[in-house]
Amino acid sequence: MTLLLFDLDDTLLGNEMNAFIPVYLQALAKRMATVADPTVLIKTLMYATRQMVENSSPDKTLEEKFDAAFYPPLGLIRSEVQGIIDAFYAEDFPKLRGLTQFRPEAVSVVEQIIQRGDQAAIATNPLFPRTAILQRLDWAGLAAEHVPFTMIPSYETFHFAKPNPAFFAEFLAQLGWPKTPIVMVGNDIELDIGAARQLGLAVFWINHNGASMWNGQGAIPPYGELTDLLPWMDGSEPKHLQTNYTTPNALLAVLRSTPAALATLTHKQEIKLEQRPAEGEWSPGEVLCHLRDVDTEVNLPRLYKVINEQNPFLAGVDTDPWADTRQYCQQDGLQALTDFTLVRLEVLHFLEALPAEDWNRNARHAIFGPTHLHELVNIIAGHDILHVQQVYEALKSLN
């Protein structure tokens, strides 16, 4: 089984965003003209959108970033104008359908993928409310209530946007880090292909004009029309579709995605995070406590030691018993997530400030032997992935 991540606009749905966005902005400004000057509103909305695109912090959803940058400068309180916005998406946004083009081949390809036992997910840029994304899927003939997409991102549930590779890491983390081959399918060289490649994903570039249009980094990726996707997959060696999260950019994206995805996975859960899925298994809350303490007492001190000392010795630490000795089962899981997010930000800031050569600094590990900082970060990322999978499976079991 392969998981296909599909871009939406100009991949599954004909939609030239350079033409769509100005009309969208004008329509929204007209609807909100009673509460904000249209010119100022459009300018402020574009600024707020940039804040979403540039967000690299896992402690704020894109919706939270947008709200903070959009409503206060306009002197608005969201709750007081939510009715106007809801009316826009219910009455005005559907009229923009005429700017888009239905692509029957997109419906056919997605249907074939589902029928053959592969999975499809929508990897559109989550800069819109969920309703705007669901409506565009409907225009594409791929209504969410009829197609079993494994994921449809939106600004309510995501913390990162394209071209940040952390978007793709968060996407996969929210799916429990699938162990299947994964392919990103999209038309945009930077947002789809370049960003997915930074994480280490296989890609297929939707391109109607041939290889001469390639101006991205690295070798020209596999490309063609949407109808060429399945023949390409069937002719590809499995190893070419495997993920590879090992470059510094990919590892930082994974580390950034962990607290973000855990926040979404645990948000508004009806079960208690301290509830164990089975006897002898950790609860989601215990996992969050574990991640917090390992980052605080093991990972961050080790990273500092490797940078500040010459080929230091790193003692092995058995952290699993902490769950019992520190009574994680009695602790507040959501508070543990908040604390983990804070220390993870310290880890990220530390790593991002390092020159490239410092990733090669050596150390001696009690268990792994001779190692270097790059390998240590790789171990942290792998540890993250295992525990995100654990939380994902626990929540699924408890629900």
Question: Where on the chain are the PLM-derived regions?
Answer:
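Asp-based, Mg2+/Mn2+-dependent phosphohydrolase catalytic module
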Residues: 1-4, 107, 111-112, 127-128, ...
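Active-site neighborhood of HAD-like aspartate-dependent phosphohydrolases
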Residues: 1-47
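A metal-dependent, Asp-based hydrolase signature
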Residues: 42-91
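Short, acidic loop-to-helix structural element flanking the phosphoryl-transfer center
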Residues: 60-64, 78-83, 90-122
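Short, helix-capping/interhelical loops that line the mouth of catalytic, cofactor-
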Residues: 236-250, 297-340, 396-399
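Alpha-helical bundle segments that constitute or directly flank the non-heme di-iron/ferroxidase center
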Residues: 243-271, 294-298, 305, 379-382
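Acidic/histidine-rich alpha-helical segments that form the ligand environment
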Residues: 264-267, 320-360
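Short, contiguous alpha-helical
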Residues: 273-319, 348, 360-399
